[in-house]
């Protein structure tokens, strides 16, 4: 059976990347550079072999330590877990290439935001977000309006004028009273773009539309530490608030479907993720 690291390295090499394998803090990683040689990247494949929650917890602790050490040396690694790679292969390949600067560029100024229904949001997120759809109240799509200043061709499958290239969803309001004033807080539940496309300014444009239409007092969201440290939220004006504990998952070793333990679904493998970081944007002054 082909090891995960072998499979990922073979994919990269077919796409023109030179790969070297190293042992970093007891984990096999792939070291590569963008095709232009300007940026180095560390890719950290994580095979899923734990047969119990306890074993998964120990593995998560060891991986978390390695991630912290690698980050201090070389920046946050791109973590690719075995279940994601095997169940969502096409999306993961495109996301991997995008991290290595192989993507089609679109700019928010060439796009328009429209409200979409939950059916449209669910279909898009199922194919382009690692966790798929989540319950929400407000759904927005980002649609390509014109081709200027980016490399997407009008004949490309993802560059068609009018095509939806990103989606953002938000919850209904959670309300509380502070100093006699009602505060309406919303969660930004999902954001995803087509994995092979980088939409410069896309998150910001969707967020600004939501703020303009709904006029929230407060917006919060979570950065999944399996993917990033959440720097994009800081760039948008959010502030980090707290760390959320890791979540235990059960995984079906045949389909590679990942489900939270609390879902009651069965599986023969276990995985504990790396938790998440909570971010908040206050749009009303309160303590």
Region spans (language model):
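Active-site/acyl-donor-binding loops of N-acyltransferases
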Residues: 222-286
């Amino acid at each position: 059976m082909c090891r995960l690291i072998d499979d990922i390295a073979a994919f990269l090499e077919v796409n023109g990347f030179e790969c070297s394998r190293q042992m970093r803090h007891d984990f096999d990683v792939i070291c590569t550079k963008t095709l232009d040689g300007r940026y180095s990247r560390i890719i950290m494949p994580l095979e899923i072999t734990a047969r119990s929650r306890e074993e998964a917890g120990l593995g998560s602790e060891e991986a978390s330590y390695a991630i912290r050490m690698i980050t201090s040396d070389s920046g946050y690694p791109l973590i690719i877990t075995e279940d994601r790679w095997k169940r969502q292969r096409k999306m993961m390949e495109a996301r991997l290439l995008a991290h290595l600067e192989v993507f089609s560029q679109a700019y928010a100024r060439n796009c328009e935001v429209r409200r979409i229904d939950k059916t449209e949001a669910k279909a898009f997120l199922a194919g382009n977000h690692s966790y798929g759809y989540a319950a929400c109240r407000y759904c927005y799509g980002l649609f390509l309006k014109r081709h200027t200043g980016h490399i997407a061709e009008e004949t490309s499958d993802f560059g068609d004028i009018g095509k939806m290239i990103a989606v953002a969803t938000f919850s209904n309001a959670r309300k509380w009273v502070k100093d006699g004033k009602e505060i309406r807080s919303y969660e930004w539940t999902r954001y995803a773009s087509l994995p092979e496309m980088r939409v410069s300014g896309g998150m910001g444009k969707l967020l600004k539309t939501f703020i303009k239409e709904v006029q929230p007092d407060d917006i919060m969201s979570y950065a999944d530490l399996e993917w990033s440290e959440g720097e994009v939220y800081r760039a948008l004006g959010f502030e980090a608030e707290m760390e959320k504990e890791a979540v235990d998952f059960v995984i079906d070793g045949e389909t590679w479907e990942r489900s939270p333990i609390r879902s009651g679904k069965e599986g023969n493998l276990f995985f504990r993720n790396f938790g998440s970081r909570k971010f908040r944007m206050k749009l009303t002054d309160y303590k």
